[in-house]
Amino acid sequence: DHGKVIFNLTASFQRPSPGLAHQVPMPDLMPPEECRDFLETIAADPGVSEESFAHMARRRPFELRNHRPAADAQATQHYQWFRIAAPVGDDPLIHRAFLAFASDMGLLSSAMLPHGLNWSTPGLFSTSLDHAMWFHADIRVDEWFVYVMDSDWSGGSRGINRGSIYRQ
């Protein structure tokens, strides 16, 4: 980007090995079949401008199903079901790459929820300053996953957002 560094990556790897295992259980959520399609959700939101709708309605590689609390709920958590919309083969690295891509969909809006804001809010500027991700096992993005996103804090024109991705 004009000779300036805009991306820095630190990665570490491990060979699969046996050992102790546990994880935080997936929250009790509505299944994807009961959630609204992403485009239906944003089309029904009177706060989304035509320009923002056109941007958000662009073609994506994923089928998305949303559950967003009402704008006046001051919620700090929302979730989105997703799966790849077209076959991508069996290469586990391709599946991980698509999961990494999906991890950036919707996360920033978590800090907007408690304030009743959305991407159409005039004067709002939003970008990721850093992003960390851990892959604990092989996955297939042609299965349903749910991305549970929340924001613990916002202030000083910054917000902290976090997400956990669970297999259905």
Task: State where each predicted segment sits.
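Terminal targeting signals and extreme-terminal segments of soluble enzymes
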Residues: H2-Q168
